[in-house]
């Protein structure tokens, strides 16, 4: 699967190995990727640059991904959110989707499924 446009995907995760692997995967198919481990820096960047897609972890020490998602809606309402987390909790999944997440993936998801989710979020009308 190849990214047809140069949409920007921002990653937010407190685990450097997840950031590196996810960035490498998205880079390999042509996405423009920005990676963050700090939720505040991520939100400041999103407010200034309005990324097309944000891939957000739920469990982070500074701020939960659900709180980040809520704040992101205020500063960059057009950014589509994908949750990528280790926490497979149906109530958290429901909250994220109800708050507007385009997709919810558990870490370890098949690369092709994750990439399809990012593509669908980047091109919601297709």
Regions found by a protein language model. Give the residues of each.
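Acidic catalytic/metal-coordinating carboxylates
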Residues: 37-38, 64-67
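Non-catalytic signal-transmission and effector/linker regions of two-component phosphorelay proteins
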Residues: 1-10, 16-23, 112-126
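Receiver (REC) domain active-site loop signature in two-component systems and cognate sites
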Residues: 60-61
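Active-site beta3 strand of CheY-like receiver
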Residues: 49-55
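Alpha4 helix (beta4-alpha4-beta5 surface) of REC/receiver domains from two-component response regulators
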Residues: 67, 88-103, 109-112, 116
